[in-house]
Swiss-Prot record:
GO MF terms, alphabetically ordered: large ribosomal subunit rRNA binding; structural constituent of ribosome
Family the UniProt entry places it in: Belongs to the universal ribosomal protein uL10 family.
Quaternary structure and partners: Part of the ribosomal stalk of the 50S ribosomal subunit. The N-terminus interacts with L11 and the large rRNA to form the base of the stalk. The C-terminus forms an elongated spine to which L12 dimers bind in a sequential fashion forming a multimeric L10(L12)X complex.
Function in brief: Forms part of the ribosomal stalk, playing a central role in the interaction of the ribosome with GTP-bound translation factors.
Tree of life domain: Bacteria
CC terms in the record's Gene Ontology section: large ribosomal subunit
InterPro entries hit by this protein: Ribosomal_uL10, Ribosomal_uL10-like_sf, Ribosomal_uL10_bac, Ribosomal_uL10_bac_type, Ribosomal_uL10_CS_bac
Name listed for the protein in its UniProt record: Large ribosomal subunit protein uL10
Keyword Nucleotidyltransferase included in the entry's annotation: no
Length: 159
């Protein structure tokens, strides 16, 4: 890999890391190409970026984007995106289904996060799920009132 290619990779990573709310670092050693494609497809569906990069290049991009404190060792795959829940969910779900995939660490909301925090975030409902729950709570009294009125109407009609 030439120096200009390395500079280009660092610039792209730096741009992506700056715009991201979450960066998750995972071990992918032993995963087949088919499984990596599955991860990439799942990530793409959730607007999450996935890339395998040398640690030295990733470290430079992380430091340049202000995301410091991550200890990078061994082989790593990086997942990042603007929505920290999506990134956490993609990583946690894939780890759950694949023994050889392991979440190592993350940088979320300006601080280094451990595996427990990533898994806790993955269990939280997404924004759309929260909105659906809220609408359901708001609609419950109206729905119950309507059911009561219909029951009263049916009772009056049967008399």
């Amino acid at each position: 890999m030439t120096r200009s290619e390395k500079v280009e990779i660092i610039a792209k990573l730096e741009e992506g890391f700056k715009a991201s709310e979450a960066i998750v670092v995972c071990n992918y050693r032993g995963l087949s190409t088919k499984k990596l494609e599955e991860l990439r497809n799942n990530a793409r569906e959730n607007n999450v970026k996935v890339q395998i990069v040398k640690n030295t290049l990733a470290n430079i991009a992380l430091n340049n984007s202000g995301k410091t404190g991550l200890v990078l060792k061994d082989t790593n795959i990086y997942l990042w995106g603007e929505d920290q829940l999506s990134v956490s969910k993609v990583a946690a779900k894939f780890e759950e289904n694949n023994d050889k995939f392991e979440i190592k660490t993350a940088h979320i909301e300006g601080e280094v996060a451990d595996v427990a925090k990533i898994k806790a975030l993955a269990k939280m409902p997404s924004r759309n799920e929260l909105l659906a729950m809220l609408l359901q709570v708001w609609n419950a009294p109206i729905t119950n009132f309507t059911i009561g009125l219909n029951a009263l109407k049916n009772k009056k009609e049967s008399e």
